[in-house]
């Protein structure tokens, strides 16, 4: 009887240890990710704070129009399926309606 109690206590302790270990690893990974995000946020803030007013204006006047022009040219690439796939679907629907009418 004493052996069964000792074995059950030992198994319970091992199970608890096995369940607690992944939780601590998950928490440490979560804290590591938060630290990385806060470091990158701080460096961005420091970079923006270190720029002079003229440098900020230069970035706004040159970089933003360039980005907007790239985005406006890239609109065709955002919807590559528009002509290719939907035209076939419309033909399929038209053929289906013609078959049921005749």
From Swiss-Prot:
Q: Which InterPro entries match?
A: CCK-like, Gastrin/CCK, Gastrin/cholecystokinin_CS
> Which ranges of residues are annotated as propeptide in this record?
21-45, 96-102
Region forming the signal peptide: 1-20
Among the Pfam families in the record, one is: Gastrin
Name assigned to this protein? Gastrin/cholecystokinin-like peptide
Origin species? Aquarana catesbeiana (American bullfrog)
Q: Which residues carry this modification: Phenylalanine amide?
A: 92
Q: Which residues carry this modification: Sulfotyrosine?
A: 86
Single GO MF annotation: neuropeptide hormone activity
């Amino acid at each position: 009887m004493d052996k069964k109690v000792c074995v059950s206590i030992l198994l319970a302790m091992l199970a608890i240890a096995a369940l607690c270990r992944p939780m601590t690893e998950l928490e440490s990974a979560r804290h590591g990710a938060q630290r990385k995000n806060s470091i990158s946020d701080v460096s961005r803030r420091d970079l923006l704070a270190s720029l002079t007013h003229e440098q900020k204006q230069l970035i706004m006047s040159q970089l933003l129009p360039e980005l907007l022009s790239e985005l406006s040219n890239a609109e065709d690439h955002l919807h590559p399926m528009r002509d290719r796939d939907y035209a076939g679907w419309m033909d399929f629907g038209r053929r289906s309606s013609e078959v049921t009418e005749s």
